[in-house]
């Protein structure tokens, strides 16, 4: 677990951990509109007042759940890149990021704007800020220049246009696999995604030193992103 995540209260309090687990189960099972703070307390076997010791409002608790989903997404990417710098290749990084993101139900729900699940959280300023700073589009926007500098993406194409093409590809693949009519229609959609990324970005010409440098740069960005997430979880922004 990365250093920023170690500061979360649930890692030091079993009550906080139970409350988060209970709130997560209720959110996934009933949607944001389908339960109260009292329901969370009952499921966690604590008094209602205990919830407010950690989260002043239900809104803060739910934003905390979404923020933690992003934190764990980033932490998973950091762990994988640290163990295997070759994962920094675009053809490997993008499928890995998509798989990790879609394995986090709240991140996936935010990407598809699932109002039934998220309710007011769908358009909440802090949800929007979390996705804008830490979502797949934000991560791609940060790592594309790193790839271009290190021989992993062609640099003869306007970076904004290149980023748009890449985001459109990944969004389309995600929708085809996990949208309302899910089912990609191919045996290995991630292999197709990897090949298409290479077709868009060009051959990955980086040597091992460049790959290690790329992985280190991406990890540094992801660690900064975790700090951003923690700030958004703990400090409401002007709404």
In which residue ranges do the predicted regions lie?
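Amphipathic alpha-helical packing segments from all-alpha helical-bundle domains
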Residues: 119-152, 157-175, 191, 195
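Amphipathic alpha-helical segments used for helix-helix packing
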Residues: 101-126, 141, 210
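Short amphipathic alpha-helical elements of helix-turn-helix/winged-helix folds
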Residues: 22-26, 100, 169
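C-terminal peripheral helix-coil segments that are non-catalytic and often amphipathic
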Residues: 2, 138, 142-150, 175, ...
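Helix-turn-helix
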Residues: 18, 26, 30-60, 64
